[in-house]
Each structure stands twice: as structure tokens, then as C-alpha cells.
Amino acid sequence: MTNKLLALLLPDALTIAQIAEAKKPRQIPDWYPDKDSLYRAVESIPPFGIYKDNYIVTGTSFSGGRVTKDNSDAKFQISLRHRLIKSILPLHTYLFLTYTQKSFWEIYKDSKPFYENNYNPTLGFGMPITRGDKVVGVGFLQFEHESNGRDSIWSRSWNRITLQAIYEIDPHFTVQAKFWIPFALSDNPHIVRYAGYGQVAGTYKTRNERFRFSMLVVKRGGWNLNANFQMDAAFRLSKISNQYIYLQYYNGYAESMIDYDRFHSYLRIGFAIKPKHFSIF
């Protein structure tokens, strides 16, 4: 009789225990920085620094048949940020300006011309994402302009209001999502069909940041499952530097503004200078 009674009561007892356990406040891991230390760190770091990855790579296309000087190139990116106001704004936000330039250089041709330059200045706010007294990520609200600086039929430009969140899952994995509202598309009204309305990315790094691997997925326009992909692998040259041997693979459209409606598949290798902790896409 006792055994039958236990059998009847045990599931309910387990359910009650599970509910009680679920109601307990979850402990936030200690490796997340606390808000006060982050605010002090922001005050102490220089207002000028690197923003996204800075790199120079060279490689060739897999979508143009055999390797030739016509489908091989060099690509480099320069990305900087500047905090415009030192003091903390309401809601613990920071006003900052960024500038990113991405260039495609046909170094294997005789005259070594620059094929395309894309300029991407932004103005926006950044703020920490918190849980309790810990900082678990960062968010951005920005106005972005991107163009190739040309005129006439070669002009390409668009403007966006972007919202981005970066969340650190644990010391190894970081995820981020970015969505935008495009406007002023008169130079290229169909660009969102190829560059989309948003992107997601994930990054894995070893605890000492010696190795990093990232994957970026940009959902193109439309309801079908189409996307642009970029995969990065980086190995740090020494334990005290932020310089990496860098491998990048791009597959999709809109790698450059001039060819936003042409498909490309490029594998390139070179060197990169990366921000500490995580890369911003």
C-alpha cells in the first residue's frame, strides 16, 4: 500500500520541486563584467580606436572558371570609431561616429587599378545590454550611409537606420543580429533584393583569443531561403598582439556596391587587426 501511495505522489512531488527550482533567480556567471567596472573602463579607454576588423587579404574567385589575373584581387577594410561625448548620456548611452572603408584592388593587372571603393560613415548611439548588475552584451542604434563615391550610371548609394544587438553567450560564443530600414535608394532601387533587410552572425573564440571563427548570414530580399554568406577564420600571431593571420570566404551578392546584383564566390587570405573580445559585422 505504501509503495502504491509513493508511486502516486512521486510525480506530483517532482513537479512541485521543479516549479520551485524554476522560480529561483538564475545566477549570472561571474565572468560577465559588472556595470560599474564597465562604465569605469569606458571612461578610461581612448575615445578613438578601431571599430570593425581591419584587414588586407588577397585571393581569387571560384565563380569565374580557372584562376586568372582578371578574377583575382586584393581586398582591404579600414574601420575606425570615435566617441563624440565623453560623458554618459541618459539610459547609459554613448554617442559615437564610425567610418568604414572597403576597397577592391586589382593588384594582378598591369596598371593595378582600384576597381571599387565603398565608404560607410555612421552616427549613432551605443549602450550596454545588462542582466541584473552584469553586462551581457551591447546594442547600437545608428544612421548609416554607404556609397561608392561615383557619379552618373556608376553611382551606388543607400541610407539605413540600423538596430544591432551583440550578446555574449559564454566566454567562447558570441551572437549578434542587425536589422535595418533602408531609404534614399534612387541610385539603386533594387539593392535590398540582394543586400536584404538584416543579418545574423556568430563567433567562436578560444579562451585566450588565439583562434577565432565567425559566420555571417545576410538574408536577401524575398520570402525564399536565399542568403549571402561570409566565413572568417583567424589565428593570432602572438599572445600579446591583436594581429591575426586571416582567412575569409564570401559567397553571394552585394560584396561590393558596384556589383551588388552579381554573384561572387571568393576565397582570400591575409592579415587582420581585430577588436578585443568580438568582431562587429
Describe each region flagged by the PLM.
Residues 212-243:
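Glycine/small-residue-rich hydrophobic helix-like segments
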Residues 19-61:
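N-terminal regions that are enriched for targeting/export leaders
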Residues 70-77, 83:
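Long, low-hydrophobicity, solvent-exposed regions enriched in small/turn-prone and acidic residues
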Residues 264-281:
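Outer-membrane beta-barrel "beta-signal"
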Residues 83, 126, 236, 250, ...:
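Solvent-exposed residues in well-ordered beta-strands and their adjoining turns
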Residues 232-234, 240-246, 254-255, 263, ...:
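Long, compositionally biased interface segments
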Residues 1-37, 278-281:
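Cleavable N-terminal export/targeting peptides
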Residues 21-22, 50-63, 70, 86-207, ...:
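Outer-membrane pore/translocation modules
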